[in-house]
């Protein structure tokens, strides 16, 4: 009879422990129910990108001196620079510049090390196409600036969590009274 009582006590303890675990997990689930949804309705709502966001590369043909620093610092030797040496003025003349964004890893080394600042990162991240050959941008396509998300009236922009914290900090700072 004694082992039977011990078995019932163990069963009761295990039942209470299981009920406590279920109750704890249910409380966690209920605490998450009060939070706002994290997802956004993508085509109609877009979040504003951060200040140092690395999107599509913008290229200014007139500033480029064909030094090929961008090719040397690229971890995958991606930019294709075609140039011709002008013997009468002893300078390189840029003929063609292209980047294949299907291969690009958006590291930003080319932008950082460019001596003439002819390369810059834009906020454009929508580069999807049905054909991967359309991702090979020449100097004309690289020179086009993307349309700003903020200026588009059909798209509602949503600030991400870091931008909300920054704006809240600024509003708190503006309310402080200094003598």
Curated annotation (Swiss-Prot):
The lineage of its organism: Eukaryota, Viridiplantae, Streptophyta, Embryophyta, Tracheophyta. One of its GO terms (cellular component) is chloroplast thylakoid membrane. This is NAD(P)H-quinone oxidoreductase subunit I, chloroplastic. The keyword Phosphoprotein does not apply. Its cofactor is [4Fe-4S] cluster. One of its GO terms (biological process) is photosynthesis, light reaction. NDH shuttles electrons from NAD(P)H:plastoquinone, via FMN and iron-sulfur (Fe-S) centers, to quinones in the photosynthetic chain and possibly in a chloroplast respiratory chain. The immediate electron acceptor for the enzyme in this species is believed to be plastoquinone. Couples the redox reaction to proton translocation, and thus conserves the redox energy in a proton gradient. PANTHER family: NAD(P)H-QUINONE OXIDOREDUCTASE SUBUNIT I, CHLOROPLASTIC (PTHR47275:SF1). It catalyses: a plastoquinone + NADH + (n+1) H(+)(in) = a plastoquinol + NAD(+) + n H(+)(out); a plastoquinone + NADPH + (n+1) H(+)(in) = a plastoquinol + NADP(+) + n H(+)(out). It is found in: Plastid, Chloroplast thylakoid membrane. Belongs to the complex I 23 kDa subunit family. It is an enzyme of class 7 (translocase). NDH is composed of at least 16 different subunits, 5 of which are encoded in the nucleus. It is a peripheral membrane protein.
